[in-house]
């Protein structure tokens, strides 16, 4: 997983999901082996960061995904 933004610059919002507290990020440009996309990450109590959700299709470049994020 790649993230286009520094972790310390990402805004996280506390959420309760399935009885568990976690912090979920704002929408950000991310990448996986399949390509670049707009999604979110979550931060667990121990500080572990992992992908949370993907909101768009995959794109070939981070610039393409960033344009979609700007339009959201």
Where are these regions (language model features)?
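Short N-terminal "domain-start" leader segments
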Residues: 1-46
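Short intrinsically disordered terminal tails
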Residues: 1-3, 67-72
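Generic alpha-helix signal with a bias toward terminal, lower-confidence helices
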Residues: 24, 48-50, 70-71
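A short, hydrophobic secondary-structure junction motif
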Residues: 36-40, 59-66
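A short, exposed loop/beta-hairpin motif centered on an aromatic-Gly-Thr core
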Residues: 46-64
